[in-house]
């Protein structure tokens, strides 16, 4: 019972770790979770886990040198204040614990850090796993009940802290969003533009992800060329920096190449437009004009495909650049359709163009 068979209980039906899906939001569980999170806007969110059996009990703050620089200092100050309540609760039980080691707060795409970049205090708890009913570890015999007790105790200490720090937590969330707007004026980058002339599906899915994170996306009012890429209205959109989610916008779009520490517990880079292979550019200096920002896009519509065919087609061709090209090829092969690869560019004259 101490060694669970792979893929273990950590994963969902698709064998994906949902605690790494807070930014990606590719799974229905995560999509539902973020809908509730943004509707509720909690002041504190606790993230309870288990870790290696030879350890004791961890609660945040994490390793200070690995804090994400986009997370306000006040977030870590409040986390440390709340930690005092956990320490008192575990001292009363005689449980061993530690902080500021092992885990960090750099990657904002997990359950204890996504809240931090959204005006909430996220707190990670890690209990040394018993992996059964009873296990011997360097600290003696540990039972399943003991492990559960520590998690319950720190859940209750969180509630006690929230009650005592109610005003501080409410003020923090208010200030988090107001300072996001004021700080935007001092940033050199005033916004981002992204687009995909040849793939409406990729543009749709990326925009859908931004909407899930409550990031404001606007129409591009006129064609611009930035960094060697041309962006055209209808096929490119703008994300202005001056908005409540300014810090999350920076976290998703910026390319960070300098760090205060050389070690990371988790992901060290996650520039999201690159994951979608989307051309995008910073709007700063002379590239930025307020009149580039058009109406806000409240929702995107999934683009519909269309088969262009003559009366007696000899063959069909489609571009591999499209987001759904691999799926289309799979469906064709699954239906016993014979498919070929073009090994060189070609131009073909058809009845439809």
Language model features by range: what are they?
Residues 1:
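Carboxylate/His-rich catalytic cores and anion/metal-binding grooves
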Residues 4-10:
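Scaffold signal of the M16-like zinc-metallopeptidase fold and its non-catalytic homologs
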Residues 11-14, 20-21, 26-28, 32, ...:
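Intrinsic-disorder/low-complexity accessory segments
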Residues 50:
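Detector for the c-type heme attachment site
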